[in-house]
Amino acid sequence: MTKTEKKLRHYITKAIADYKLLDKGDKAMLCLSGGKDSFGLLKVLHGLIEDKTYDIDLHVYTLDQSQPGWDDSQLRKYLDDLGVSYEIETKNTYGVVIDKVPEGKTYCSLCSRLRRGNIYRYAKEHKMDKIILGHHRDDLIQSLLMSILYQGQIKSMPPKFVTQDGENTVIRPMVLVQERDLIEFAKEENFPIIPCNLCGSQENLKRKKVKKLIQDLALENPKVPSNILNSLSNVLPSHLMDKNLLNSLEN
């Protein structure tokens, strides 16, 4: 086991323990997009199940969105060799996105909503206890700033949440993992990564701008990323302007 994998194991098991993400006997589906993050999470979590750290029934779900150039042959081989239960489901969400999004606009928002809808539907149909997503620490940091700058809300990606209908529980075991470690791990493991030819081809996305902003700030103060992350668990309601929060503090 490489140093990088040991590091990933440490932070993933810490998040699972700290936020009580998994329970014994869980039937859990890991959403494998074909990118470095979900591949890294799968490899580490599969190893933790193999060595009996976790007693869960793991199923891998991949959504083929019918994008041009999609080739999952190497992904299938990887999953077969790993020996995990999996399903690659084909849905033409690409056609919907191309039809609905005006030329010049970014696809990410609609594409992610359609993908999320299919994930939730599949989880319900197969009675999954948990939906496992591969978002990492940097995703949380960027999402917080994006919510503030572009939506006027203070929110990000929680380690665990239940959907509004109460049907699905979503968990993110990599909330403490840095993207740079996942990049290194992907190089070490040579994962058969499938690039996104839809949103990946679009420049000047908001997330890229926010990522660059954080990187620039970190050059002046390396603690900026960790400070942003820590702010998500160090909330001072009395110092905010939410009337409902302030009223609840007074009552």
Swiss-Prot record:
> What are the names of the required cofactors?
Mg(2+); [4Fe-4S] cluster
User: The motif PP-loop motif: which residues?
Assistant: 33-38
Q: How does it assemble?
A: Homodimer.
Species per Swiss-Prot/TrEMBL record: Francisella tularensis subsp. holarctica (strain LVS)
Q: Give the record's GO biological process terms.
A: tRNA thio-modification
Question: Matching Pfam families, A to Z?
Answer: ATP_bind_3
Main location group: cytoplasm
Q: What else is known?
A: The thiolation reaction likely consists of two steps: a first activation step by ATP to form an adenylated intermediate of the target base of tRNA, and a second nucleophilic substitution step of the sulfur (S) atom supplied by the hydrosulfide attached to the Fe-S cluster.
Where's it found, cell-wise? Cytoplasm
Q: What is its EC number?
A: 2.8.1.-
User: Which InterPro entries does the entry mention?
Assistant: Rossmann-like_a/b/a_fold, TilS/TtcA_N, tRNA_Cyd_32_2_STrfase, tRNA_thiolation_TtcA_Ctu1
Q: In which pathway does it act?
A: tRNA modification
Q: What is this protein called?
A: tRNA-cytidine(32) 2-sulfurtransferase 1
Reaction it catalyzes: cytidine(32) in tRNA + S-sulfanyl-L-cysteinyl-[cysteine desulfurase] + AH2 + ATP = 2-thiocytidine(32) in tRNA + L-cysteinyl-[cysteine desulfurase] + A + AMP + diphosphate + H(+)
The family database entries (SUPFAM superfamilies) matched by this protein are listed as: Adenine nucleotide alpha hydrolases-like
UniProtKB keywords: 4Fe-4S, ATP-binding, Cytoplasm, Iron, Iron-sulfur, Magnesium, Metal-binding, Nucleotide-binding, RNA-binding, Transferase, tRNA processing, tRNA-binding
**One GO CC term, this protein:** cytoplasm
Per UniProt, [4Fe-4S] cluster binds at: C108, C111, C199
Q: How is the cofactor bound?
A: Binds 1 [4Fe-4S] cluster per subunit. The cluster is chelated by three Cys residues, the fourth Fe has a free coordination site that may bind a sulfur atom transferred from the persulfide of IscS.
Summary of the function given for this chain in its UniProt record = Catalyzes the ATP-dependent 2-thiolation of cytidine in position 32 of tRNA, to form 2-thiocytidine (s(2)C32). The sulfur atoms are provided by the cysteine/cysteine desulfurase (IscS) system.
Any GO molecular function = tRNA binding
